[in-house]
C-alpha cells in the first residue's frame, strides 16, 4: 500500500524558515518523480514544484522558486520542502504527491502550516 506522510508544521514566524518532510512507503521511492502542492484557506490547489528520481531536475512554479527548495533523500525514502522568508500567504495545507508521468496519482493527507506574526 502506497503511503505518504507529511510532517513539519504547524507554526512558523513571519519571515522565518521551515522544513517540511514527506515519508514515503509501499513503493520504490527512488524511481519516481515527487511533487509538492499546497492549498491556502478558501483557495484552490497550487502546484509548488517537482523533483526527478535523480535530483537532477527540479521544477518550480516561477513565483515560488526563490523561497522554496525541494530535495529528497532516497536512502530515507523522504521528500523535503525547505521554506524561507515565509509570508502570511504561505499559510496553507501542504501535500506531497507521487507523480509518475506528470500525473499525481498518490497524495498524502497534508500538513498544516500557519504563518504567525
Curated annotation (Swiss-Prot):
Disulfide bonds join 22-96. Keywords: Adaptive immunity, Disulfide bond, Immunity, Immunoglobulin. Residues 1-116 form the Ig-like domain. Gene3D superfamilies: Immunoglobulins. The keyword Disulfide bond applies. One of its GO terms (biological process) is immunoglobulin mediated immune response. GO terms for molecular function: antigen binding. This gamma-2a chain was isolated from a myeloma protein. This is Ig heavy chain V region MOPC 173. It comes from Mus musculus (Mouse).
Amino acid at each position: 500500500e502506497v503511503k505518504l506522510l507529511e510532517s513539519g508544521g504547524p507554526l512558523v514566524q513571519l519571515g522565518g524558515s521551515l522544513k517540511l518532510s514527506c515519508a514515503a512507503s509501499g513503493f520504490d521511492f527512488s524511481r519516481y518523480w515527487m511533487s509538492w502542492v499546497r492549498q491556502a484557506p478558501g483557495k484552490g490547489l497550487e502546484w509548488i514544484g517537482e523533483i526527478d528520481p535523480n535530483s537532477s531536475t527540479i521544477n518550480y512554479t516561477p513565483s515560488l522558486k526563490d523561497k522554496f527548495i525541494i530535495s529528497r533523500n532516497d536512502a530515507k525514502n523522504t521528500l523535503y520542502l525547505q521554506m524561507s522568508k515565509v509570508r502570511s500567504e504561505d499559510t496553507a495545507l501542504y501535500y506531497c504527491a507521487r507523480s509518475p508521468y506528470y500525473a499525481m496519482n498518490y497524495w498524502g493527507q497534508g500538513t498544516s502550516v500557519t504563518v504567525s506574526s
